[in-house]
């Protein structure tokens, strides 16, 4: 929403609501001030600070308040005595609103009337169906697939396989194909991993995509990222309301796994941080056998009591490796490519590395691989 600041009505006391004559006099005075102010700005101001763009957000609608940019208010003669302000629709209609100065933020704020002004002019929040929030998990990179909500795809005309343009925060565009699997689920395929790397998306991070169409071409634009699911206040400011409620599992569903284990996250207790790290020496015998051994006390301290996959993130948190925990005694099958993963992360045979248990995804532990032991 574009605002063009042209006048401010200065009042020390509220205008009596039962005095029609005073209302007319005040409105006439406002029109006169607006006219004189416009003439002086046209002659003396060329800085372009007489207008600014206001974003309609869930937060300012809920609070019925809008903070004005400091450079705009200072260049247009607003002072702390201003009590009322008029907003127009560019035509004959105008809305009178309260104006106050927030000392803590050193900014002017429109109060009591902002929500009504938005309703009257049809200014609403962006269409919530255009947004979807997903979490980057290791399988997204290993399988080179990003699974998206069926409802999101259907509501945005993406129900059929096609090429989609992915747009990063810096405007970089990468083509990706939207695929339909035999199960009916749809995902982003070729091009998705390059997009994740180009925008430095990290494992465990939440990010929001916005669906945009340009000349009949589908576009998914990176709207924002957030590393903490619990930081609700920050997400309310940056993401649409609907995005706070819908999280999409980005991993292909295994029919043998109980439904209750999906989409769960268990953060490691920070009080036992020292027990989250394990120093291991890369010995030739283990590399040849494709095995990794985790001590029982380490597994117990981190709540690892189920066999299954474990994930290890490289030093750049984009390259990763996974293995199968075969027994509760800590025997892990890491495969024949384990050696190359270690070497690519700066660890050769005979050297030590550190595994730090970061968190769990779907009850599966995720470790950070560090080339220097004890750090």
UniProtKB/Swiss-Prot annotation:
Keywords: DNA-binding, Nucleus, Repeat, Transcription, Transcription regulation
GO terms for cellular component: nucleus
Transmembrane parts of this sequence: none
Taxonomy, superkingdom: Eukaryota
DNA-binding region: 51-147, 131-226, 277-375
Major location category of this protein: nucleus
Compartmental location: Nucleus
Any GO molecular function: DNA binding
Gene3D superfamilies membership: DNA-binding pseudobarrel domain
Signal peptide coordinates: none
Pfam families assigned: B3
Protein name per UniProt: B3 domain-containing protein REM-like 2
Species name: Arabidopsis thaliana (Mouse-ear cress)
């Amino acid at each position: 929403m574009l605002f063009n600041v042209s006048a401010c009505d200065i009042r020390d006391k509220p205008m009596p609501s039962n005095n029609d004559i005073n209302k007319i006099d005040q409105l006439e005075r406002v029109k006169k001030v607006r006219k004189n102010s416009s003439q002086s700005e046209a002659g003396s101001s060329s800085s372009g600070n007489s207008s600014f763009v206001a974003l309609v957000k869930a937060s300012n609608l809920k609070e019925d308040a809008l903070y004005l940019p400091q450079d705009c208010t200072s260049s247009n003669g607003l002072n702390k005595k201003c009590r009322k302000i008029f907003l127009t629709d560019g035509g004959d209609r105008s809305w009178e609103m309260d104006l106050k100065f927030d000392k803590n933020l050193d900014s002017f704020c429109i109060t009591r009337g902002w929500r009504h002004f938005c309703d009257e002019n049809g200014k609403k929040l962006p269409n919530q169906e255009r947004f979807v929030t997903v979490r980057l998990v290791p399988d997204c990179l290993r399988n080179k697939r990003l699974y998206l909500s069926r409802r999101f795809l259907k509501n945005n005309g993406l129900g059929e396989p096609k090429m989609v343009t992915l747009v990063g925060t810096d405007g970089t565009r990468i083509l990706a194909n939207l695929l339909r699997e035999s199960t009916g689920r749809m995902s982003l395929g070729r091009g998705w991993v390059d997009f994740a790397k180009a925008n430095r998306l990290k494992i465990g991070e939440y990010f929001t995509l916005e669906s945009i169409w340009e000349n009949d071409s589908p576009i998914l634009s990176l709207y924002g990222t957030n590393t903490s699911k619990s930081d609700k206040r920050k997400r309310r400011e940056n993401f649409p309301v609907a995005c706070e409620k819908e999280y999409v599992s980005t991993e292909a569903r295994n029919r043998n796994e109980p439904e209750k284990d999906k989409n769960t996250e268990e953060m490691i207790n920070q009080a036992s941080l020292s027990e989250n790290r394990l120093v291991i020496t890369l010995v030739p015998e283990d590399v040849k056998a494709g095995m990794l051994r985790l001590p029982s006390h380490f597994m117990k301290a981190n709540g690892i009591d189920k066999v299954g996959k474990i994930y290890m993130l490289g030093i750049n948190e984009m390259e990763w490796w996974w293995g199968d925990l075969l027994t509760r005694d800590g025997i892990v099958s890491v495969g024949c490519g384990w050696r190359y993963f270690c070497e690519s992360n700066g660890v050769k045979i005979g050297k030590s590395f550190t595994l730090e248990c970061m968190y769990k995804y779907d009850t599966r532990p995720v470790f950070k691989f560090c080339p220097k032991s004890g750090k």
